[in-house]
């Protein structure tokens, strides 16, 4: 694929084919196996007047990664008359915050017999289960020329912005606290090295409390956590008083462990908690919802 090579494309192609020059270009798009594999296939060409661009962020490699779909040639793919080896992925600081910067270095070696240029690609993957995020995203690349047998160190810099997506409710770029994977590869489907990065943000997403809000969401917010925590303690005390044997463990009675109970409560919406707790507690929960929205500044 020579793309629009200009007036001298014929001579350039001749030099590449006969080995006078080592190719070092990379595809800036994905070549699918079939036309029907394109993410826009169902929406194009539209109704003759309007076209619905329904792919959202899932275009190119983001779409094929999410679908785990094989392709003809991947984003970032390129040919060479030599081969390259990656090693020593290093991040001196393995944690990052909103204002910090992490240096990422990797060694690249030309293991062939011809001088060449390699395009080192850095991708980032959100490992926190954040809804609506791609499997990975390109966040940096660098082209480096290497003599046969030569090794060079390539350096990247990652900031919070590289981990983030634009959050409409917040009106700002946002990345949740947690674990992110740093991937180094020859192309989007040829990942050679992986490393983990821990991120901590001070940004708080806007929260409006309703019956559909889960206990886990409330426990994760510094304003609502003390309020819901107090309610849970009151409920735990009430359940303990209802037991005929004060020494009996509620978890044993339910036949489950502490972790399973914690996971169940984490995903439980307040309206389910209200129905579980009885009429008196349901009224208390309704008042608590109003109080939490006031504390959050919601009207």
Predicted features, each with a name:
Residues 1-117, 183-184:
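Secreted, periplasmic, or luminal enzymes acting at the cell surface/secretory milieu
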Residues 8, 70, 111-117, 129, ...:
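Intrinsically disordered or highly flexible coil/loop and linker segments, enriched in small
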Residues 18-22, 224, 233:
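Sec-exported extracytoplasmic/periplasmic mature domains
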Residues 58, 68-70, 80-206:
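Intrinsically disordered, low-complexity Ser/Thr/Gly-rich stretches
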Residues 108, 229-232:
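A short glycine/threonine-centered beta-strand motif
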Residues 200-220:
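Low-complexity, Pro/Ser/Thr- and charge-rich linker/hinge segments at domain boundaries
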Residues 220-230:
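Thiotemplate assembly-line natural product biosynthesis machinery
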Residues 232-299:
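Extended, compositionally biased non-globular segments
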């Amino acid at each position: 694929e020579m793309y629009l090579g200009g007036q001298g494309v014929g001579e350039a192609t001749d030099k590449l084919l006969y080995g006078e020059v080592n190719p070092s270009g990379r595809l800036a798009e994905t070549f699918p196996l079939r036309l029907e594999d394109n993410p826009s296939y169902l929406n194009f060409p539209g109704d003759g007047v309007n076209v619905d661009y329904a792919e959202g962020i899932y275009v190119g490699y983001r779409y094929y990664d999410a679908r785990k779909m094989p392709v003809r040639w991947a984003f970032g793919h390129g040919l060479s008359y030599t081969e390259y080896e990656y090693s020593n992925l290093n991040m001196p600081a393995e944690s990052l915050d909103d204002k910090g910067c992490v240096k990422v270095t990797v060694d690249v070696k030309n293991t062939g017999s011809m001088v060449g240029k390699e395009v080192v690609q850095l991708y980032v993957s959100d490992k926190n289960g954040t809804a609506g995020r791609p499997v990975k995203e390109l966040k940096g690349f660098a082209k480096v020329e290497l003599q046969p047998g030569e090794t060079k160190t390539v350096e990247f810099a990652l900031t919070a912005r590289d981990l983030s997506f634009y959050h409409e409710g917040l009106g700002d770029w946002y990345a949740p606290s947690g674990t992110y994977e740093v991937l180094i590869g020859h192309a989007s489907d040829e990942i050679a090295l992986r490393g983990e990065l821990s991120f901590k943000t001070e940004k708080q997403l806007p929260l409006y409390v309703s019956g559909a809000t889960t206990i886990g969401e409330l426990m994760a917010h510094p304003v609502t956590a003390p309020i819901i925590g107090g309610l849970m303690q009151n409920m735990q005390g009430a359940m303990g008083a209802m037991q005929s044997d004060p020494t009996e463990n509620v978890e044993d009675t339910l036949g489950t462990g502490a972790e399973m109970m914690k996971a169940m409560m984490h995903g439980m919406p307040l309206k389910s908690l209200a129905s579980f707790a009885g009429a008196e507690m349901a009224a208390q929960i309704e008042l608590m919802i109003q109080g939490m929205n006031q504390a959050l500044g919601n009207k």
